[in-house]
Amino acid sequence: MFKINFRLSLRSLLRHKLYSFINVSGLAVGLASAILICLWIQNEVSHDRFHPNIDRLYLLNNRDQNNGGLYVYNLTCRPLGPAIQKDYPEVERVVRYDNGTANFLISNGDKHFSINGSFVDTGFFSVFNFPLLEGNPSTALNSAKNIVLTEQLAKKLFGNEDAMGKTVKVDSVDYQTVTGVLKDLPGNTNFKFDYLLPYAYYSKLYPNNNDWNNGNLLTFVTLKPKATVAEFDRKVANIIIEHTKPGEATNKIFAQPYKDAWLYSNVENGQYVGGRIELVKMFSLIAIFILLIACINFTNLSTARSEKRAKEVGIRKVAGALRSSLIVQFISESILLALVAGIGAVGIVQLTLPAFNKVVGSRLVIDYSNPWYWVYALLFIVLTGVMAGLYPAFYLSSFQPVKVLKGSFKPVKALLTPRKVLVVLQFTFAIALIICTIIVEGQVRFAQNRDAGYRRNNLAFVIMFGEAKKNYELIKKGLLSSGAATAVAQTSAPMTEIWANGNGFVWKGSNTDDSKTNFNLYSADKDFSTTMNLQILQGRSIDYDNYKTDSTGVLLNEAAVNEMRLKNPVGEVIRSMYGGPVLHVIGVVKNFIIESPYQPINPMMIVGPIFGYSVINFRINERPSYGENLQKAEKVFSQYNPQYPFNVRFYDKEYAVKFADEQRVGTLVGLFAALTIFISCLGLFGLAAYMAESRIKEIGIRRVLGASVTNITGLLSKEFLRLVGISFVVASPIAWLVMHSWLAGYPYRIAIEWWVFAVTGVLAFFIALATVSVQALRAALANPVRNLRSE
């Protein structure tokens, strides 16, 4: 029976090559799109969920008041972890992870690498599933003299030699023994490091750094099986307040399920409420709709050809075929077609996956060696085939043989309404996606064009390691005298990142709530404003060479002045409730963007050397050659900091990263909008071909009676264009509602303009007209005499 159905299905598909090709192409593109989206979704939802006891693993967070609301941050202090491990019996294991202070120069002989490392507690490998290729995970980090390397770093340092037991030099100071080689980290993890050092080594470097007010690491806890997170949160909430002086700290600790940390990162009033999970939901819907559109193509074309297949059904029923056997045959046809499309889809995915990975910024792969992949893929394809063929199978098998064979059965008119509905559904989704794409791209451009407050072109920076800090003046002199740079300044952090913030500041006229205001904190030297091209609005910039009191001088940005309600800020005195130097305001600088360009600028204090300098900023001279001067800069750094590579970064590129997520969304939505249009047009092309074929006698008569090619083309096109018009009317409010909700998350946002809908409508009409006109012109230009004779 199966063999007979297969043979009949294959024969039917080969007999109608055009419709089979259209169906296979549409389903293949739809399946490929769905597979790509599913790969991305699987990567997102599995992010850091592969660790043991993930349901009991939590990341500790702080919740504090700021500017009248609650905000959340996850950097915690060093003594927090040991205190929790000691005093909270419901906690099974505590692990600290410090990714900010372990960036050393790792050397083996003449091989030097300034790369990203992390300090971790001894039990790191018992909490996180990062397998060691060599070494014992229980003992690899139990000594201050140990180091664990990733496989990639081990190969860079030792080539093909076994790294285990060998020593590497850390910052030209200490020798560490390699006690583990770690399999390179997967793409679906938040952890980023090339080597791990034990906290015992950190304690050796910084023996007295146990300040409960200084948070710069992540603290993870694994609760015991019977412990509840609600009870733990209640007990741990005030631990920071209990270990600090009265009034010194206001932040409360709570535990966030780590399995949700990647997907739920947005905060509203102190609670995690959303984040990338919204993208997962959105692209899940897009995948479903794209597949649905491909299935609609199959349904429309199958039912459109019902008149031609009616006699086949009638004869088979007269010959004794049961309706159930006809249903099985028609569904078999759709499954066979889906299998062929599935093979094409796998090929499309394989060809496009590298480009797709670039767009989404991931390392997605298909594990062909996994038998479950093939099982799921086959089920997915078969279900798609069944879904696509179910309605046509039941409809075609319902024909009454007497009416069919007598010629009184006219199925086309009966099917017009459902077919129209399906076409409207297709184009509604496609038009909505196009509108969303235009608005997302507009929002990204709006943020990109927002005044950053400083000039980014030709501006670069190098983070100071090794001898760079000691030799800063020599490096600065070398950069300027060689002509490599036109200006040089040192700062505590890059202009695109926040490395320090704090509250507890009081000033004349401030109140209790003001002390909870969080300020971004930044150290800069006297060349800062000229190097960055900042605009000083009041007072002057920091110049502690000519003004000795500027060692405690502070520049405020406009946001800080507004938050502090200062009418005449220059000369105002600012004190910290926690002690430290008394600051005096020497100037006001125009707001400049450090954090998100989509969000309001936060209050900021810029001081002299109080927080220390960690970054050299320099503006590269364009004359006579940008590239030549960059090489000169490299020589200067190599001369005065020879042990460290010249790891230069550029502010225009660093700033562009801030738009990556929104640009990625816009690109993906645009890509799938184009694919949706393509699939819809395939179906429209097939329907137009069938309609032209079914009305061939009418067209011939009209041509003989004098109808022009334009008249015939308009006759065949107007019905489809009317459907596209209905789709536009339905899609526009849907797209407006979706985009209005999306834009509401951005304080700085565009308005949704009428022209977006007008352009989309014209584009949709043009695409539909071009698709239908191909078949309409072909029918109109055909010889009417030959068509009438054949009839």
Where do the language-model regions lie?
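Membrane-proximal juxtamembrane linkers immediately C-terminal to transmembrane helices
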Residues: 42-63, 89, 131, 189-191, ...
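Interfacial "coupling" helices/loops that link adjacent transmembrane helices in transporter permeases
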Residues: 16, 294-336, 683-721, 775, ...
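Membrane-helix entry/capping segments
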Residues: 1-6, 10-11, 15, 19, ...
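Small-residue-rich transmembrane alpha-helices
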Residues: 32, 36-39, 254, 335-401, ...
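Alpha-helical transmembrane segments of integral membrane proteins
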Residues: 1-24, 270-272, 302-339, 347-469, ...
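Hydrophobic, regular-secondary-structure patches
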Residues: 44, 58-116, 123, 155-160, ...
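Mid-to-C-terminal secondary-structure elements
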Residues: 118-134, 147-275, 474-661
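Hydrophobic alpha-helical transmembrane segments of multi-pass inner-membrane transport and secretion
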Residues: 15-41, 275-311, 339, 418-441, ...
